[in-house]
Swiss-Prot record:
InterPro entries: hnRNP_C, Nucleotide-bd_a/b_plait_sf, RBD_domain_sf, RRM_dom, RRM_HNRPC/RALY_subfam. This is Heterogeneous nuclear ribonucleoprotein C. The modification N-acetylalanine is found at A2. The gene is HNRNPC. Belongs to the RRM HNRPC family. RALY subfamily. There is a cross-link at K232 (Glycyl lysine isopeptide (Lys-Gly) (interchain with G-Cter in SUMO1)). Residues 190-224 form a coiled coil. The modification N6-acetyllysine is found at K175. Residues 255-276, 288-306 have a biased composition (Acidic residues). Tetramer composed of 3 copies of isoform C1 and 1 copy of isoform C2. Assembly of 3 tetramers with bound pre-mRNA gives rise to a 19S complex that interacts with HNRNPA2B1 tetramers. Component of the 40S hnRNP particle. Identified in the spliceosome C complex. Interacts with IGF2BP1. Interacts with PPIA/CYPA. One of its GO terms (biological process) is mRNA splicing, via spliceosome. It comes from Oryctolagus cuniculus. It is found in: Nucleus. Pfam families: RRM_1. The lineage of its organism: Eukaryota, Metazoa, Chordata, Craniata, Vertebrata.
Length: 306
């Protein structure tokens, strides 16, 4: 751990010393400060006080690297304000003026070498640095917010005094400025409104065209559906008529076949009857011939007997 001595006034020590302002010392300790700033070089001294701290490096290059790397960093909820102790920042605030470290250290003698009683030397160093910080900044670490801007008071019409002409002129100027700004803002708003209206009209036209196209598509689809239904009904009717015709033809053909079959049967019956009659006649003729033959035989036998 580095020593607590950070108040040497020789130029080399002052140029290699880093001031750390706006430090939350309720949370951040000396070991934390050394751990953060030791990465930029060897630390030979480190002192932490109420709201600020000092880090003493061996050379100026390490100190400048630490300022460049850690200035503006947020630690424990507060943004650090870091700079070289010999080169304070110029525009740190309006309420106070920052003095150079050389002026602050000029009339203060250097502390003697650290004695075995470290507590006494630490107390002296702490008091010296606190006095340095208090005199260096005559304003609080956190600048209070600016007061609210008061509205311009408009003088009444009854107060017509020559001594208030300058005030009236100022108020008039403020009014004119406000009116000019309001007119500009009104013009800007009017232009914006016109542009918005144009965009809305374009969008409306596009939407209307889309709706019209959708309606056309729906109408075409409905027409196509009706045509398809009509075609289907016509096809069904034609198919049904064809089926009816086919059935009629079949019925007629079947009826003709039946008639022809009946006629054929009748003809067959007639032929059969004719054939039967012929056969009967032949049989009768055969019987007659046989009887005549027998008679002839009988007559021949009688003649022989006589």
């Amino acid at each position: 751990m580095a020593s607590n001595v950070t108040n040497k006034t020789d130029p080399r020590s002052m140029n290699s010393r880093v001031f750390i302002g706006n430090l939350n010392t309720l949370v951040v300790k000396k070991s934390d400060v050394e751990a953060i700033f030791s990465k930029y070089g060897k630390i030979v001294g480190c002192s932490v006080h109420k709201g600020f701290a000092f880090v003493q490096y061996v050379n100026e290059r390490n100190a400048r690297a630490a300022v460049a790397g850690e200035d503006g960093r947020m630690i424990a909820g507060q943004v650090l304000d870091i700079n070289l102790a010999a080169e304070p920042k110029v525009n740190r605030g309006k309420a106070g003026v920052k003095r150079s470290a050389a002026e602050m250290y000029g009339s203060v003698p250097e502390h003697p070498s650290p004695s075995p009683l470290l507590s006494s030397s630490f107390d002296l160093d702490y008091d010296f640095q606190r006095d340095y910080y208090d005199r260096m900044y005559s304003y609080p670490a956190r600048v209070p917010p600016p007061p609210p801007i008061a509205r311009a008071v408009v003088p009444s019409k009854r107060q017509r005094v020559s001594g208030n002409t300058s005030r009236r002129g100022k108020s008039f100027n403020s009014k004119s400025g406000q009116r000019g700004s309001s007119s500009k803002s009104g013009k800007l708003k009017g232009d914006d409104l016109q542009a918005i209206k144009k965009e809305l009209t374009q969008i409306k036209q596009k939407v209307d065209s889309l709706l019209e196209s959708l309606e056309k598509i729906e109408k075409e689809q409905s027409k196509q559906g009706v045509e398809m239904k009509n075609d289907k009904s016509e096809e069904e009717q034609s198919s049904s008529s064809q089926k009816k015709d086919e059935t009629n033809v079949k019925m007629e053909s079947e009826g003709g076949a039946d008639d022809s079959a009946e006629e054929g049967d009748l003809l067959d019956d007639d032929d059969n009857e004719d054939r039967g009659d012929d056969q009967l006649e032949l049989i009768k003729d055969d019987e007659k011939e046989a009887e005549e033959g027998e008679d002839d035989r009988d007559s021949a036998n009688g003649e022989d007997d006589s």
